[in-house]
Design a protein with these regions (language model features):
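N-terminal type II signal-anchor transmembrane helix
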Residues: 1-51, 89, 108-109
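Active-site SXXK
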Residues: 82-83, 229, 299, 359, ...
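Non-catalytic, structured segments within soluble enzyme domains
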Residues: 22, 27, 111-367, 532, ...
Length: 850
């Protein structure tokens, strides 16, 4: 009895000593433990999602893929699968499970290694939220204490919901919602019992038991989970047998992107990072943009097709690679497929390998293991590329172009496969709502995988004749009218700085003598623009451009400004054209309409400053009177004083060129009124003439009339020296769009496809705005305006219509007449008399070439 008594005393002492040691250890560790109360308000790391204006997902950013689900959204079978596998006594313990610890220790003692885990679900939750993954005794002790605290703070359902949303399940999937989507492309409530068991088996070793990594191990682990569920009574024998017999159909499923707009999505990502830092990728923000699927896809298609058309005009540069030569042993299909899978795709272009070729047909293997046929029709364009200005002869048979063993690029055209190549030229498109500044579509290049440089907002390119509408607006604000006569004859003036004559020329070099300003813009006459520039003064013109939002540092103060030597981005150009389309208001482009937090609360909503030509909003600049430039007198030349030429327009502080393109919260405000509404209408009307011309002459943008078949549009071509840049910008009802095309390498020009008498069927022609950029504008605008009722140009108050003589710009006295618009008070008062001289802007050059 004494022995038993001593044994009991010893046991009590050991228990007290153990309890005291545990308490002392707890008091020592307690200051190091995190506050588990934060779990009450925990915010799981949820990726940022970017949506279109109509709610379609277009991008997702974040290292962790998580789709939060509530416990009542998770099927009971999935919950039971995790409990049976990870913590069968979950509802019985209080954070740590002594029975589980004893069982795991016994197995380890007798087997010689730890084959069973002793961590409860609550301990795993503590580790996932608060501790590092290091395997140390101190971490296990902290984990146990934290688990006890968590059980005191949260009920079992709250613990389960946090755990099932937090646990890492492989392939960047965190939580059961993300795992269901990643592996099976389903929501959790759509999973079969077998699929639930696969996911429940992953926490132990997400990489080892991953069905995308090892199907055999995934099946074995699934069967273990099903066995545990059966032994715990969660499923019947019949359910077990059926689930165990099912094959696992798992594939990687990326986020379900409805459509892609990568350049604009990247702009959103950058804006969100600038605002919120790294938390932008983790706090579950949902960003709604201003674009829609139809419009954005039309823009991307228009740009890609136009770039490919340009590239084909200039010839075939040959295969991307030669994998084996004719006569050598061909590669087997697996080696070909593996090689192709490692290559990217660029828009519609797919990598392929020619596996056979004869004069009539070639067969090419694709990355998915299928083969396609290429015929002469799909490679007739492939003249050998010699330079940007010359191509070789038209191929006559398939083997003139491709040979077996070549790695090429192909694309589908209608139901046929065509030979293709990755273009070296690039392009951008920006489309805005001119009333609000909302970005309707944005394309920053041919393909984001090819180049992430966003040419729509980052590429400063010379604008060429795209600048002329702005400069003519400045000239008309200082006294010229659409009927003013300017001398279309060559100019030659000594340039002391260059030590030679400066001789701006028309393109093509054709001259018509005195013509009206409307025709000068419509036919893009360079020398006419130079004369108007000289009439108003270079400094005045340069300062005036800032009204349209163009940054001063990119504007040159020389006469070459008249020919478009200033450099702007497509976004800046589109914004400038919006002023002419909306009645004279400088809108701020924006692309984010709304931001929601992870709970669906709106934390930002755009309140753009809108254009309102019907509102009584004064112009923020003083208007220059007509008398400052022209008196209505019959003189052959008009002299303008040097003081008048260089007088600058007072400029209030405008936005920086590279503004953050996101509208701010606040009450409704109106955009700055920078040119008066009647003046904006005049230049808008002139841009319409650039497309439709007049009897006797065509505008440079005439193709838009043919392609769109509507009269409520206007636009302007733009081409720089040596065709390094080509533009087309213009408007339609509710939309303004600018398209640029060129090479990123400023040393290269778009060139011309030079004709050769020795080569038949050679394409030849000048690569300028109308040929190189306008096709994309036309295709895009046709798609966007489909179904939009035509809206005729209606003169605003302050505009009068006068019948003028086409040859003189004076009041009509015969049949050669047209109706012309004037700001009230600027219309001509004299009848046209052809025998007497007319007021002509000629600038008094001392050297005339004819």
């Amino acid at each position: 009895m004494k022995f038993v008594k001593y044994l009991l005393i010893l046991a009590v002492c050991c228990i007290l000593l153990g309890a005291g040691s545990i308490y002392g250890l707890y008091r020592y560790i307690e200051p190091q433990l995190p506050d588990v109360a934060t779990l009450k308000d925990v915010r799981l790391q949820i990726p940022m999602q970017v949506y279109s204006a109509d709610g379609e997902l277009i991008a997702q950013y974040g290292e962790k893929r998580r789709i939060p689900v509530t416990l009542d959204q998770i099927p009971p079978e999935m919950i039971n699968a995790f409990i049976a596998t990870e913590d069968s006594r979950f509802y019985e313990h209080h954070g740590i499970d002594p029975v589980g610890i004893f069982r795991a220790a016994s197995v380890a003692l007798f087997s010689g290694h730890a084959s069973q885990g002793a961590s409860t679900i609550t301990q795993q939750l503590a580790r996932n939220f608060f501790l590092s993954p290091e395997r140390t005794l101190m971490r296990k002790i902290k984990e146990a204490f934290l688990a006890i605290r968590i059980e005191q703070l949260l009920n079992k359902n709250e613990i389960l919901e946090l755990y099932l949303n937090k646990i890492y399940l492989g392939y960047r999937a965190y939580g059961v919602g993300a795992a269901a989507q990643v592996y099976f492309g389903k929501t959790v409530d759509q999973l079969s019992l077998s699929e639930m068991a696969v996911i429940a088996g992953l926490p132990k070793a997400p990489s080892t038991f991953n069905p995308l990594y090892s199907m055999d191990r995934a099946i074995a682990r699934r069967n273990v989970v099903l066995s545990r569920m059966l032994s715990e009574g969660y499923i019947t024998q019949a359910q077990y047998d059926q689930a165990r017999s099912e094959p696992i159909d798992a594939n990687y499923h990326a986020p379900e992107i409805a459509f892609s707009a990568p350049y604009l999505s990247e702009m959103v990502r950058q804006e969100m990072y600038n605002r919120y830092g790294e938390s932008a990728y983790e706090d579950g923000y949902r960003i709604y943009t201003t674009i829609t699927r139809k419009v954005q896809q039309a823009a991307q298609q228009a740009v890609r097709n136009n770039v490919l058309d340009y590239d084909m005009r200039h010839g075939y540069r040959g295969p991307a690679n030669v994998l084996w030569k004719v006569g050598e042993t061909a590669w087997d299909s697996k080696k070909i497929t593996d090689t192709l899978k490692a290559l990217p795709t660029y828009g519609p272009l797919l990598p392929a390998v020619v596996t056979s070729a004869n004069p009539q047909e070639a067969t090419a293997a694709l990355a998915d293991g299928t083969s396609v046929s290429l015929h002469m029709e799909g490679m007739r364009w492939a003249r050998p590329y010699r330079s940007d200005t010359q191509q070789g002869p038209t191929p006559r048979k398939v083997t003139d172009v491709v040979q077996t063993g070549q790695q090429i690029w192909v694309r589908q055209v209608d139901n046929y496969w065509w030979l293709a190549q990755v273009p070296e030229v690039n392009s951008a498109l920006v489309s805005l709502n001119p009333q609000t500044g909302a970005v309707l579509a944005l394309v920053g290049g041919f393909d984001f995988n090819q180049s992430k440089f966003n040419r729509a907002t980052q590429a400063l390119r010379q604008v060429g004749s795209n600048i002329k509408p702005f400069l003519y607006t400045a000239a008309m604000d200082k006294g010229l009218t659409l009927a003013s006569m300017l001398n279309d004859v060559p100019i030659s003036r000594w340039d002391a700085g260059a030590g030679s004559d400066w001789r701006p020329k028309n393109s093509p070099p054709q001259y018509a003598g005195p013509i009206r300003l409307r025709q000068g813009l419509g036919q893009s006459k360079n020398v006419v623009m130079v004369r108007a520039m000289r009439a108003m003064g270079v400094d005045y013109a340069a300062e005036y451009l800032q009204r349209f939002g163009f940054p001063a540092q990119n504007i040159v103060h020389t006469e070459s400004l008249a020919l478009g030597s200033a450099s702007f981005t497509p976004m800046q150009v589109a914004r400038g054209y919006a002023v002419m389309a909306n009645g004279g208001f400088l809108i701020d482009p924006y692309f984010i309409s709304k931001i929601e937090n992870d709970q669906g609360g709106v934390i930002f909503e755009a309140k753009p400053k809108i254009a309102c030509p019907e509102c009584d909003i004064p112009v923020i600049y003083g208007n220059t009177q007509k008398s400052d430039v022209l008196e209505n007198t019959n003189v052959e030349e008009v002299a303008v004083s040097q003081e008048q030429q260089n007088s600058a327009v007072p400029m209030p502080e405008l936005e920086q060129a590279n503004q953050a393109l996101i509208a701010q919260n606040g009450t409704q405000e109106y955009a700055p009124h920078v040119i008066n509404t009647p003046l904006a209408f005049l230049i808008k009307s002139a841009l319409n003439t650039n497309i439709f011309g007049e009897p006797g002459w065509m505008g440079t943008g005439w193709r838009a009339a043919r392609d769109l078949k509507r009269r409520d549009i206007g636009g302007k071509t733009g081409t720089t020296n040596s065709s390094k840049d080509a533009w087309f910008s213009g408007y339609g009802p509710g939309v303004v769009t600018s398209v640029w095309i060129g090479f990123d390498d400023h040393r290269r020009d778009l060139g011309r496809t030079t004709a050769s008498g020795a080569i038949k069927d050679q394409i030849s022609g000048y690569e300028g705005g109308a040929k190189s950029a306008q096709p994309a504008w036309d295709a895009y605008m046709k798609a966007v305006l489909e179904g939009v009722p035509e809206q005729p140009l209606t003169p605003p108050p302050g505009i009068v219509t006068v019948n003028i003589d086409r040859s003189t710009g004076q009041l009509a006295s015969g049949g050669n007449s047209r109706e012309e618009y004037f700001i009230e008070g600027t219309q001509p008062t004299q009848q046209a008399v052809h025998e007497v001289g007319t007021t002509i802007i000629d600038n008094g050059e001392t050297h005339e070439l004819f």
